[in-house]
């Protein structure tokens, strides 16, 4: 056996140990936070974020569980704006039409997203590939000219952004979902990731109720 052949197995055990400690503390961490914890604990095993990401995928496949059940939150880049209100039970209502040009940041806590109470008076949901275009549309209050909900992941969608889009589709199945992406292979790939999910998240997507989103 090659000297480094055992490293992937050791990484899995190290991540399991760290997740066990996180769950005992009843906290959640992002993948980035987990990387820094592992970098301090075992720098020779986890020199980069890529090693952590791959090990998490291996662990999810091994245990047949979601990363959230391991205490790992989805990192989210997503923003939402427009004719939609969000309310976590017992908390104040967030009106996404009043969040300014930056929009409302989508939480990476998938349990929280599942609990949100949604209300909308939009006619369309529009996925916007580019963050700059999203900002321009929100500055111009486009969602009042054409009653709509705007959502962006600033490129390829993360799990949290895609899950909120799924929640919106589940709550308002009659709302058409449109996409504003570049007319090139990269834009098509982003559209397909929103619609079908990614290969990398395939082992977990169904656990979050993910389905084919009718974009």
For each feature predicted by the language model, list its residue ranges.
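Nucleic-acid enzyme cleavage-core boundary/entry regions
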Residues: 1-178, 185-215
């Amino acid at each position: 056996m090659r000297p480094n052949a055992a490293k992937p197995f050791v990484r899995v055990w190290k991540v399991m140990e760290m997740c066990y400690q996180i769950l005992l503390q009843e906290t959640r961490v992002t993948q980035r936070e987990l990387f820094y914890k592992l970098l301090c604990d075992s720098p020779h095993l986890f020199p980069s974020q890529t090693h952590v990401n791959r090990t998490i995928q291996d662990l999810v496949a091994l245990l047949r569980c979601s990363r959230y059940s391991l205490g790992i939150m989805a990192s989210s880049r997503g923003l939402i704006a427009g004719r939609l209100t969000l309310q976590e039970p017992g908390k104040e209502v967030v009106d996404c039409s009043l969040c300014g040009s930056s929009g409302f940041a989508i939480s990476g806590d998938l349990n929280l997203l599942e609990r949100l109470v949604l209300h909308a008076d939009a006619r369309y949901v529009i996925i916007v590939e580019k963050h700059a275009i999203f900002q321009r549309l929100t500055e111009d209050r486009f969602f009042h000219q054409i009653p709509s909900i705007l959502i962006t992941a600033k490129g390829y969608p993360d799990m949290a952004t895609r899950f909120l889009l799924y929640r919106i589709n589940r709550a308002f199945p009659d709302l058409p979902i449109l996409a504003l992406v570049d007319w090139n292979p990269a834009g098509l790939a982003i559209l397909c990731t929103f619609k079908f999910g990614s290969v990398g998240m395939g082992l977990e997507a169904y656990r979050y109720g993910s389905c084919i989103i009718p974009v």
